[in-house]
Amino acid sequence: PWQWLAAGWKDLWQTPAASISYGLLFVIMGYVMVYLVESRFHYALALTTGFLLAGPFLAMGLYDISRRLQNNEPVHLGHALFAWSRNPLPILLFGLLLGLLMIVWARLSAVLFGVLAGGRELTLDPSTAQLFFSGSGLTFLLIFTLVGALVAAAVFTISVVSIPMLLDRKTDFITAILTSITAVRANPGPMVMWAALIVIFTGIGLISAYLGLAIALPLIGHA
């Protein structure tokens, strides 16, 4: 994984304009999410974790930039934004699958928050903090984290290889998913470390008021 990051760092600074511009789109998306949820804590947490789930699909343009660099092809932001056109139908179907998983996660989140809050809306205020640090709140956080980790692991397993493969070859999305699953099963150690690094770098980007995503996500995407 560290070699992947080194390669990603190299690609990032070979095409800084296209890569960072693409990363800034994630920053804008982050601010749009903040605006939409306002102070509603449960929506904010669900959307943030959903953003992580959609990350592999959203980073498709960065994969294409690295592919073009490897093949000595010209690179600009337009190529990244329309990377899906290389293999549109399988990529669309894979995107729909990820969208379905995000909907499932959103519904699970709503149910879990409903149980914790007793049906009332959670907002960013001291009473919500007290609720989360109560006995039931800590239990909720544990369950929420475990369920979220399972969903995230499933998404990572089916997408870590599949999306780059769909861009590189004219293959169907089922074959790409099965190949991704096989790769994860064959290399559990490096894949777990890579998943952890993705969470760490994305987390740094999120807690830096989303600005860090302009560098963190292109770095991960190129790697």
State each model region's role.
Residues 1-223:
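Hydrophobic alpha-helical membrane segments
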